[in-house]
């Protein structure tokens, strides 16, 4: 019975729960890696004593957080749980493929861990650029294991993407148009299309790297007529859509949270929100070389990528101001979920502004590979994606579990986390502006103060993570059951009770076609 339910599951709710648990666990691993990094950088001089090991930590931290924490939780966890409920579908379109998508992740994670256990580990950075990732600078199986890990995670995501696209397009009630689906459903749809179009390019790139390493091909080796810059183009053609994949489901969740706790029945500017997400998805594919301003592109190429990158700020601004407009005039309920959402809006905007700075190719030549870039993407990930995940978690936890969190503890948790992440990453802007480079385990004494403060912030965030574990434990032991949920008329996922029955919508949902 246990095996049938959890190993061979075809139920979107159970698979969503598996994704959430796996992502939470991987998040702990990724947090551990980040704390080792910050411990090393807490003061000048060496702690770990081996720069290869330091770079392995940095690489593993990135891979774990991206592929095994943010994506499984946002797309696999929230996506699986909420999309079928929100469109009135009995399950996902391909329930067994859904199960396979999940079970490809633990082996993938195992391969990534194995890569750091053999030889010297993969100290390449998450970009895995050759020639550093080639078989001279990284002899041994480490990088090969990392590549296989990425292949499995990629297959998992591609299958999941096919599943979500099919489900969202095909499994709505006949009377429901695409423009009647909630914004979270749209965000998952756009995310799935991005995954489907970008991951095969990554697969091609890392497969060529694999053959360069093992079969003497020279795709990325100038000695045989190859070009390492080709790898960078292939990688970033995936890598840039990937960062939008990481944030788009968060956009969808924030729209729901802001609308709900503003007491509104719908978000401000639904169509604008939808097309902003679609625009972001499209533009995400035509700006990749802004990660490569320092490789010596023509000035006109740099001008194009600078301009195109800045254009993304427009649909993003549409979303930010629509969230603020949704809040405007609302009957605001100061719940922990809304606090996460407001934190998201502010900090994501700050991260977006530093992104506009980096979009300027002339400035980026100077700032590339400094801590300014680290600060930028951690503002949009560690305070964008993660805040969205936390907001979504405290908002939908009663739906998933049937129990309510202790609101006071949840607010305290938010405050500690808010202080921790800002103390960690705000000083890194200063470090970058004064020229401290990324991916080094040591630094000149001049950078000591801000690094020490940054490392202190990371340990404050650690206490927040530990408090979160306590809060979840407290909810499950106190067993405060959900009595009623407001605004179910425009929040369909709550309609079946908390938690919903194992099978929902066993007969087709009724949709009033006169809805406008």
From Swiss-Prot:
There is a cross-link at residues 240-244 (1'-histidyl-3'-tyrosine (His-Tyr)). Belongs to the heme-copper respiratory oxidase family. Mg(2+) binds at residues 368-369. Binds 2 heme A groups non-covalently per subunit. Binds a copper B center. It comes from Balaenoptera borealis. Component of the cytochrome c oxidase (complex IV, CIV), a multisubunit enzyme composed of 14 subunits. The complex is composed of a catalytic core of 3 subunits MT-CO1, MT-CO2 and MT-CO3, encoded in the mitochondrial DNA, and 11 supernumerary subunits COX4I, COX5A, COX5B, COX6A, COX6B, COX6C, COX7A, COX7B, COX7C, COX8 and NDUFA4, which are encoded in the nuclear genome. Component of the cytochrome c oxidase, the last enzyme in the mitochondrial electron transport chain which drives oxidative phosphorylation. The respiratory chain contains 3 multisubunit complexes succinate dehydrogenase (complex II, CII), ubiquinol-cytochrome c oxidoreductase (cytochrome b-c1 complex, complex III, CIII) and cytochrome c oxidase (complex IV, CIV), that cooperate to transfer electrons derived from NADH and succinate to molecular oxygen, creating an electrochemical gradient over the inner membrane that drives transmembrane transport and the ATP synthase. The gene is MT-CO1. Gene3D superfamilies: Cytochrome c oxidase-like, subunit I domain (1.20.210.10). This is Cytochrome c oxidase subunit 1.
